Amino acid sequence: MAELRLSLNDQVTPELLRQIQKLQHPGKLMKGISLELLSLTEKAFEKEGDPAKWKSLAASTIKQRNKKGHWPGKMLQVSTAGLAASVQPFSSATEAGISAGSGRSAKYAAIHQFGGQAGRGKKTTIPARPYLPMRQNGSELDLTDGARKSILEMMYDYVQK
């Protein structure tokens, strides 16, 4: 008859238990992930692109902003209470993410992330200017390669420490 014997030494067991406990209570990791997503978003606003530079504003938009004293300036940051300021991290013990826009401004946030028709009668085409670290893949949203890499590194570090 075959016999299987498993023995753990005292040095391995506490470390293994610590790692298992970390995985049972990942709230700290989730908070870190949400803050990393926020940081990546802030970098996209600063660089006005992620990874490719955003398409320039329409000449009519530049003229309108210039008239109001908002040009030159950042494309999606006309006011301090605008789109960039609306991006907020959220986390719990089981999830992490960021949100952009709320209420009426949610449509504004989405049109700039994904592009599409806007304005009265939906006659204006707004090009996608992705600022969140995610891309549309059919009906799904995927993290960008950079965001995925950062999060995987955070997860690895979390378990190793």
Model-derived regions, located:
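Short, Lys/Arg-rich flexible segments
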Residues: 1-161
